[in-house]
Amino acid sequence: MSIERSVRRAVLGDESILREVRLQALSDAPDAFGSTYEREIARTTQDWQRWMSPGVAFILDEPAGARGMVAGLRDETDPSVVHLMAMWAHPKIRGSGGADELVVQVIAWARSEGAKVVRLKVIQGNDRARCFYERMGFRTTGQEEMRLRDGQIEVQMERSIEHAAGDARADESG
């Protein structure tokens, strides 16, 4: 039985969907993100529009509703770098390939923007996420940073992007 799902780029009008998925993510894994439930629930529609505007967001849709999201944002000082952020997949779809589809979309977007590297941060000790990103071709860089809001250590990971023609899955091994 195949899962009916699609990953699509978020557009104006998707603010309430992004908000709903982001709040689910923060309820499910409050320590995994740089923000808090309290901060995100207070965001207005205009805040969500601004959140989408400097980069890109993708939503994973299934018949049961939105089940995941991810965002990509160009680095402010280095145009060759795109940051993968706000990655989350609903617990019921983990291990089914949905998270892979979200990451592949950010990689494809980064490639189309001319980026050479996709970079992310993962909380130290979140081995499931780290292993997932390693499977997607990311490697730790040795850079670590203490998150100010709670003292958690964030480990930086990145992967280079091959600019050859073809789909983003072709270079998943890094």
Residue ranges and their predicted role:
Residues 116-117, 123-130, 134-174:
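C-terminal "cap" of GNAT-fold acetyltransferases
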Residues 4-7:
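Extreme N-terminal starter segment of soluble prokaryotic enzymes
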Residues 17, 97, 101, 105, ...:
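Alpha-helical macromolecular-interaction surfaces
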Residues 9-92, 103-105, 109, 144-146, ...:
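Acetyl-CoA-dependent GNAT
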Residues 94, 111, 134:
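Short polybasic/polar patches that bind polyanions
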Residues 90-96, 124-125:
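Active-site acidic-Proline motif in GNAT/NAT acetyltransferases
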